[in-house]
A protein has these predicted regions:
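An anionic, turn-rich surface loop/hairpin at beta-sheet edges
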Residues: 64, 100-129
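Transition segment at domain starts
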Residues: 24-73, 155-158
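Sec-dependent bacterial lipoprotein signal peptides
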Residues: 1-21
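Short, surface-exposed beta-strand/strand-loop-strand elements in extracellular ectodomains
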Residues: 90-109, 149-154
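Noncatalytic modules at the cell exterior or secretory-pathway interfaces
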Residues: 77-83, 124-152
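Short edge beta-strand/loop segments characteristic of extracellular beta-sandwich folds
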Residues: 72, 81-87
Length: 159
């Protein structure tokens, strides 16, 4: 073997190894935007208090503080649950921050984590049972690729 053929073989081997170690590909920014728009354009379900949509970056293992999207309600209501979805394959973790009015006039926030919500065409319903709700925040995180998430907040106001 000549030096040239050894060098070419080494370069080919390195290229092959590098190809096997690349990060998983995700949707393009245009695909993410189109998916987010389609979620916002869908017919609202009964009992919709609000919706939240956000982008997620790969390799962010911890939730943001404060939540990525926060919804506030002028009149305290009842929270029945959330419908969570995310773009692509894999899974995503969600933190849902529920802020309630306290009897003494202050507020209290509790964070509920929904881990490993599968991404794909089907949304996942998660039950929550809270009254006197004045705000809900949502954060999606711990993705293995860039993408997006969507959450529908379900319940009733004035309850």
């Amino acid at each position: 073997m000549t030096r040239t053929s050894v060098a070419r073989a080494a370069v080919a081997l390195l290229a092959l190894l590098a190809a096997g170690c690349t990060a998983p590909t995700g949707p393009t920014p245009d695909e993410v935007t189109a998916w987010m728009d389609s979620q916002d354009d869908a017919a609202p379900p009964a009992g919709l208090l609000g919706s939240a949509t956000g982008r997620v970056d790969a390799g962010v293992p911890e939730p943001s503080d404060p939540p990525q999207v926060s919804l506030g309600f002028e009149t305290a209501g009842r929270l029945d649950g959330v419908r969570l979805s995310c773009l692509g394959e894999g899974s995503l973790d969600f933190d849902v921050s529920v802020t309630t009015e306290e009897a003494a006039g202050g507020t209290r926030t509790q964070v509920v984590t929904f881990a490993d919500v599968p991404c794909g065409p089907d949304a996942r319903d998660e039950a929550l049972d809270a009254t006197a709700v004045v705000g809900v925040g949502v954060t999606g995180y711990d993705a293995d690729r860039a993408g997006a998430w969507h959450a529908l907040v379900l319940g009733a106001t004035g309850a």
